[in-house]
Every structure is written in structure tokens, then in C-alpha cells.
A protein has these predicted regions:
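Sigma70-family region 2
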Residues: 19-20, 46, 57-74, 92-95
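Short, charged helix-capping/linker segments at alpha-helix termini
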Residues: 2-5, 19-28, 38-57, 156, ...
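Arg/Lys-rich amphipathic alpha helix in sigma70-family domain 2
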Residues: 67-71, 84-102, 108-113, 136, ...
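N-terminal module of bacterial RNA polymerase sigma factors
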Residues: 1-36, 43, 122-132, 148, ...
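Short, Lys/Arg-enriched C-terminal cap helix and immediately downstream tail that follows
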Residues: 70-71, 92-95, 150, 155, ...
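Structural recognition of an alpha-helix C-terminal capping motif at a helix-to-coil junction
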Residues: 39, 53-60, 73-85
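Helix-turn-helix DNA-binding module
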Residues: 141-181
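Amphipathic, Lys/Arg- and hydrophobic-enriched alpha-helical face
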Residues: 30-48, 65, 80, 147, ...
């Protein structure tokens, strides 16, 4: 509890420094949140150069708009929101073509792991085989390909939930969507990645 209070106090002081225009405030912001911003930006854009540009854009946005932060949510939540929007906009700027609807290229699965409409296809259950789930170099490559294939909005939810460890409610607040929608998209994104790995593991 005390750590959370200390963190909130540090954020409050950092924000106050930004509003006062103090020279070291932006550097302090970068040191405190830079890694988080880059991690999320890369998770959405899947491109190092784009993620670095998003990082710079977000830091400048925070420096310019620090006065508009009303404190209704944690500073970190606000930064997540700014970063997610910036990363998604970066992707939209690079891909003008209309993306295929997620329903057309992401499979759906039943709770027992079977693909909807196909009882012969069952996702591998790795929970009882920890050695098999270890991400070796080749398997990691397959996972990266699966992430690349996800629409950016789904990647954003996946990174916020599974990498940044936000709750479903926090993710919904960041992206401006309902909790039910977050849960649905998160499930489909996870299942798509799991199917990608299942296919790879099944290869001789």
C-alpha cells in the first residue's frame, strides 16, 4: 500500500514539474515511463523505428498537454491511453488499405479448445507438458509471426493485459471500450496465437 502511495506522490510531483516547465521534468518522465511507452508502442506497431517515433511523440505530447491531465485516473493510465492511441495512429498512417474484418481471419474456439464448427480440431493442452511450452528460438519466431498477423487493436489489448499486466477494467478504460469487448478480443487474440503454436508443435 505504501509503495502505491509513494508512486502516486512521485507521479504528482512529476506532473507538477511538467506544468511548471522545469527543464529536467521531461527527462524524469522519460526515465520513469520510457520503457513502458516503448514496450507498448513496439507491441502495437511491431516495428522498432515506429516504436521509437511513438516514444518521442508521446513524450512531447505529455510535455505539451500535461496541464490537461485532470487527475481522475492514475498518471500511468493516462500515459497508456496516449501511447496506445499514438501507436494505433502510426499503424493507420502506414497502412491505408482497409483491414480485413477480424471475424474473417481470426478463428473462434469453444471453451473446451475445439475450433467452432470443427470438432476434429483441438488445440494442444500445454499445461501438462511444461517442457514442450518452453519458447525455443524457432517457436519464438512462430509466436512473433502470430503477433504480426493480429490486427493492431488486438495487439494493443494483448500487450496491455498480458505484458503490462493491466486488469480487464483498466484495459477497457485505456482503449475506451467495454470490458466485455476487451475480454472477447483478448480471448480471440490468445486463441489465435495458441493455434499458431499448436500447428508448429504438431510438425514432425
Amino acid at each position: 500500500m505504501s509503495q502505491a502511495i509513494d508512486s502516486a506522490a512521485a507521479d504528482f510531483e512529476l506532473l507538477a514539474s511538467l506544468r511548471r516547465g522545469e527543464g529536467g521534468a521531461l527527462m524524469a518522465l522519460a526515465e520513469r515511463y520510457g520503457s513502458m511507452i516503448y514496450r507498448l508502442a513496439f507491441g502495437v506497431t511491431r516495428n522498432q523505428a515506429d516504436a521509437e517515433e511513438v516514444l518521442q511523440d508521446v513524450l512531447l505530447t505529455l510535455a505539451r498537454k500535461g496541464e490537461s491531465f485532470e487527475g481522475r485516473s492514475a498518471l500511468g493510465s493516462w500515459i497508456y491511453r496516449v501511447t496506445t492511441n499514438a501507436a494505433l495512429n502510426k499503424r493507420r498512417g502506414k497502412r491505408r488499405e482497409v483491414e480485413v474484418s477480424i471475424e474473417e481471419h481470426l478463428p473462434t474456439f469453444e471453451a473446451d479448445g475445439h475450433r467452432s464448427g470443427d470438432r476434429t480440431y483441438l488445440l494442444a493442452d500445454w499445461s501438462q507438458d511444461p517442457e514442450r511450452t518452453a519458447l525455443a528460438g524457432e517457436t519464438r519466431r512462430v509466436l512473433e509471426q502470430g503477433l504480426d498477423a493480429l490486427p493492431p487493436h488486438y495487439r494493443a489489448i494483448l500487450v496491455l493485459r498480458d505484458v503490462e499486466d493491466l486488469s480487464n477494467e483498466q484495459v477497457a478504460e485505456v482503449i475506451g471500450d467495454s470490458v466485455a469487448s476487451v475480454k472477447s478480443r483478448l480471448h480471440r487474440a490468445r486463441m489465435a496465437l495458441r493455434e499458431q503454436l499448436t500447428r508448429h508443435m504438431a510438425q514432425p
